[in-house]
A protein has these predicted regions:
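Thiamine diphosphate
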Residues: 1-117
Length: 117
C-alpha cells in the first residue's frame, strides 16, 4: 500500500499533465507532502510560497481569478489555525476555483489536539 503523501504527489503530477492550467502552491513542505513530485514534473507551475499561510490563500485566489487552477499543499494544522479566515472570506465566499490539500491531520500522523490546542 502506498503512503498517502505519495498518492498526493502522484495525483498532483497526473493533474498537472492533464491540464496546463493546474498550479501547485506549497508552504515550504514539498518534501513532507510529496508535492516535490509535481515540482520535478512541472517546475514552471510549482510555486514555493514559504511560511505565510494567509498570503498563500490570497495568491491562490488571485491566480484562480485569471484562469489558473491552484492546488494548495500544506499541513492541516496550518489551514485550520492560520488560514481559516482567508479560506472563508477569499475562497468560500467568492466561490474561487482553489483546491485545498491538507496533510497530516489527526492522531495517526502525530498531530493530536493536545499538540495544537
Amino acid at each position: 500500500m502506498k503512503a498517502m503523501r505519495d498518492v498526493w504527489g502522484d495525483t498532483l503530477v497526473a493533474l498537472g499533465k492533464a491540464n496546463p492550467n493546474v498550479l501547485v502552491l506549497d508552504a515550504d513542505l514539498a518534501n513532507s507532502t510529496k508535492a516535490d513530485k509535481f515540482a520535478k514534473a512541472c517546475p514552471e507551475r510549482f510555486l514555493q510560497m514559504g511560511i505565510a499561510e494567509q498570503n498563500f490563500i490570497g495568491a491562490a485566489v488571485g491566480l484562480a481569478s485569471v484562469g489558473y487552477i491552484p492546488w494548495l499543499s500544506i499541513f492541516a494544522v496550518f489551514f485550520t489555525h492560520r488560514a481559516v479566515d482567508p479560506i472563508r472570506m477569499l475562497i468560500a465566499q467568492t466561490h474561487a476555483n482553489v483546491k485545498l490539500g491538507a496533510a497530516y491531520a489527526g492522531a495517526w500522523s502525530g498531530c493530536s489536539f493536545s499538540k495544537i490546542a
